[in-house]
């Protein structure tokens, strides 16, 4: 049985691996799509959640809306993009935050991310 990984994007963007050569993706989204596809090649089951309207599978990665995350699924790893508050949406054995920017304490407090960061 393959391990299950979920990636939860905190942005309001709607995208999938089909958009990798388009204009809407930034570096973080592109990096995570490529990482997801590599994980799939290694035998992992990958769910990728953002604001996408319709579920689709692209290059082995299942994309669906983060509002439709099933908390009864126990993932082996949950990766949240920059916001530990996203972990409240999911059940997982391990959690990791993917952030490409510096998070000063002020920003953690302002965006109410400090407690979830320490909690998860």
Residue positions per predicted region:
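N-terminal subdomain of nucleotide-sugar transferases
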Residues: 1-49
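Extended catalytic core of nucleotide-activated donor transferases of GT-like folds
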Residues: 50-120
């Amino acid at each position: 049985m393959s391990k299950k990984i979920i990636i939860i994007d905190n942005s309001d963007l709607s995208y999938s691996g089909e958009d990798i050569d388009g204009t809407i993706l930034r570096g973080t989204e592109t990096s995570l799509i490529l990482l997801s596809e590599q994980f799939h090649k290694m035998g992992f089951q990958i769910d990728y959640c953002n604001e996408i309207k319709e579920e689709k599978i692209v290059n082995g990665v299942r994309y669906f809306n983060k509002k439709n995350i099933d908390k009864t699924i126990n993932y082996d790893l949950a990766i949240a993009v920059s916001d530990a508050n996203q972990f409240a949406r999911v059940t997982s054995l391990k959690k990791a935050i993917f952030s490409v920017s510096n998070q000063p304490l002020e920003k953690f407090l302002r965006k109410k991310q400090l407690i979830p960061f320490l909690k998860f």
